């Protein structure tokens, strides 16, 4: 829910982009970015040096034009009827945000 609330604030305040950057080797972070609705924008090769190794950075972003679709997807996911009595989700967040994303990460 925190990502949803943060994105809601970002776009309500008039920002045009909300970015997610991570080590390109961090597949869980890349999967999370897509699940939350960030669109894959590419890899910045040798973006920085971390602990003596070149680190490629994977870039993802939501833009203000994406937000109406993503907000509706999050609302549907957070709706009480999307959850079973034991708390299990009926529809996965990633499935709901997928149609809103401009591009998927080919590395996943």
Roles of regions detected by a PLM:
Residues 1-108:
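Acyl-donor (CoA/ACP) binding surface of acyl/acetyltransferases
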């Amino acid at each position: 829910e925190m990502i949803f609330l943060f994105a809601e604030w970002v776009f309500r305040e008039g920002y045009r982009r909300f970015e997610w950057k991570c080590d390109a080797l961090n597949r869980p972070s890349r999967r999370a970015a897509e699940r939350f609705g960030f669109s894959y924008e590419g890899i910045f090769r040798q973006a920085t040096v971390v602990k003596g190794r070149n680190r490629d950075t994977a870039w993802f972003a939501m833009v203000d034009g994406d937000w109406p679709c993503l907000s509706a997807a999050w609302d549907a996911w957070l709706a009480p009827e999307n959850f079973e009595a034991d708390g299990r989700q009926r529809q996965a967040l990633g499935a709901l945000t997928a149609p809103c994303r401009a591009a998927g990460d080919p590395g996943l």
